[in-house]
């Protein structure tokens, strides 16, 4: 196993490792002197097995798994390893939105590693074909976890720190993976911070109405009038459609194409509903650019836009523009290009990463969420197990296994695990699908008041609610304790006492 583009030198140590070792002395001094916490990540590729669990089909074939590494704050031989378990996206985007981990590395003198998930970003087992039908068979949670485990072992071996305590970090699906790493590979990972990790929902154990009910609650909490206006806008669109006033809908909402079929209406409803999902998840108290550029407090801004228009459908258009037309340069909404329906009703996005996530939502990740216009403010859009199964057969030729995560990763019964923090924000619609109470003295659940999707993983900001400041302090304390405990558990070197 090696790394690209660097090649091993004569003694078998990859050249990137030599660079890392040569710079350690300087970096250890800078860790306390630098006032700006830029981790100076370096991008590398690791030769990863394509298939960890089959010795025949792919033999020893490998692909390049991308990872980012920073030793800027690391005290070699004493500092831990902070290992981010990448999720459904480009690893640079995830690293750039996880500043708390960098801050914590500076405090605790840790080596930083951000590992990209197979089939996402540039970690493509079959190149550009990877997310096409017929090439996705190696995209599983288990394969991704094995990637992380093999990479971590190789890093520790190459750096000569086989006993360095490692803490896994992740947010959302990545938070699930960080918890799973602690559960499946406890000899490698001493603890995990699983931020906004919906481990219950994805195992098929949640309420299918919960997600969009909680999105609605965010907007109702901002303004009951806003939530009612959303209901009114969707009802007006439906009424106009039933009257055959397709051009009126297109003109008022601003679609590039006129609606002409029930399929178009469902697509429009999904397109608009997705905008609310994004705003609720990204409801941070300062401007961000994670899923796209958004202003501070986007739920509040969205409601203001909606209510500022006298015509409700035009108000809905103004709100959707926060997500789909942040530049203000789009003349209209291409509802089929900007939003693609998939096996995740909360949205897959577009492009290669979206196709990979759609496949995962068709196999192991169970996301059968409905909106019903009773417990939520959205049009009735069902997504049952039966509808999911048919979609996945048609799209990928696969049968979902709705109960598999309960079997493989315990569902919500995690009492036998240890050293995992499950953090959730009370504004995050994913929180209801996660662990929200302590399961033991070391399976800890914390709630961030005024917190959106994995707010605690983001860099400190002067606009942060007081709750997230306190939660980060708790997380830092627990992680420091886990690292110290892992050090104490390391076996002492055997001493040969000599002949009696």
Swiss-Prot record:
Primary localisation category: other
Give the Pfam families listed for this entry. Answer: Peptidase_S28 (PF05577)
Q: Which residues form the propeptide?
A: 34-36
* Catalysed conversion reaction: Release of an N-terminal dipeptide, Xaa-Yaa-|-, preferentially when Yaa is Ala or Pro. Substrates are oligopeptides, preferentially tripeptides
Gene Ontology BP term (one):
protein catabolic process
Source gene? Dpp7
Record's subcellular location = Lysosome; Cytoplasmic vesicle; Secreted
Q: What is this protein called?
A: Dipeptidyl peptidase 2
| PANTHER family listed in its UniProt record | DIPEPTIDYL PEPTIDASE 2, PROTEASE S28 PRO-X CARBOXYPEPTIDASE-RELATED
Q: Which superkingdom heads the taxonomic lineage of this protein's source? A: Eukaryota
């Amino acid at each position: 196993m090696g790394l690209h583009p660097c090649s091993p030198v004569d003694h078998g140590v990859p050249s990137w490792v030599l660079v890392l070792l040569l710079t350690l002395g300087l970096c250890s001094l800078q860790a306390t002197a630098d006032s700006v916490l830029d981790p100076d990540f370096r991008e590398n590729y690791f030769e990863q097995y394509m298939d960890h669990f089959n010795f025949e089909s792919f033999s020893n074939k490998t692909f390049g798994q991308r990872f980012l590494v920073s030793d800027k704050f690391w005290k070699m031989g004493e500092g831990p390893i902070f290992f981010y378990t990448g999720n459904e996206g480009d690893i640079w985007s995830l690293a750039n939105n996880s500043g708390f981990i960098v801050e914590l590395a500076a405090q605790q003198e840790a080596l930083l590693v951000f590992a990209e998930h197979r089939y996402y970003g540039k970690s493509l087992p079959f190149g550009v074909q990877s997310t096409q039908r017929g090439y996705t068979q190696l995209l599983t949670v288990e394969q991704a976890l094995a990637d992380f485990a093999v990479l971590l072992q190789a890093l520790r071996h190459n750096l000569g720190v086989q006993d360095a305590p490692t803490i896994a970090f992740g947010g959302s699906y990545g938070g699930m993976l960080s918890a799973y790493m602690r559960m499946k590979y406890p000899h490698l990972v001493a603890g995990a911070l699983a931020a906004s990790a919906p481990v219950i929902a994805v195992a098929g154990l949640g309420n299918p109405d919960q997600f969009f009910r909680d999105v609605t609650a965010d907007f109702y909490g901002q303004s009951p009038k806003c939530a009612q206006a959303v209901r009114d806008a969707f009802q007006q669109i439906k009424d106009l459609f039933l009257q055959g006033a397709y051009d009126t809908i297109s003109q008022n909402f601003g679609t590039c194409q006129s609606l002409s079929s029930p399929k178009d209406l469902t697509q429009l409803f999904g397109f608009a509903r997705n905008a609310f999902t994004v705003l609720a998840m990204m409801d941070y108290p300062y401007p961000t650019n994670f899923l796209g550029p958004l202003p501070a407090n986007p739920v509040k801004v969205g409601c203001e836009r909606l209510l500022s228009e006298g015509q409700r459908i035009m108000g809905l258009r103004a709100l959707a523009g926060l997500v789909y037309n942040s530049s203000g340069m789009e003349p209209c909404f291409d509802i089929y290009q900007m939003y693609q329906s998939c096996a995740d009703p909360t949205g897959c996005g577009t492009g290669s990463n979206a196709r990979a996530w759609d496949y995962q939502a068709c196999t192991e990740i169970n996301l059968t969420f409905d909106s019903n216009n009773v417990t939520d403010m959205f049009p009735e859009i069902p997504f049952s197990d039966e509808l999911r199964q048919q979609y996945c057969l048609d799209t990928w030729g696969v049968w979902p296994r709705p109960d598999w995560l309960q079997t493989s990763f315990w569902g919500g019964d995690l009492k036998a695990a240890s050293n995992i923090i499950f953090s959730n924000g009370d504004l995050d619609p994913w929180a209801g699908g996660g662990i929200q109470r302590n399961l033991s003295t070391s399976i800890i659940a914390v709630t961030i008041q005024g917190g959106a999707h994995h707010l605690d993983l983001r860099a400190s900001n002067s606009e942060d609610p007081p709750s997230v400041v306190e939660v980060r302090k708790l997380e830092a304390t627990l992680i420091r304790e886990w690292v110290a405990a892992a050090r104490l558990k390391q076996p002492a070197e055997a001493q040969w006492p000599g002949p009696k």
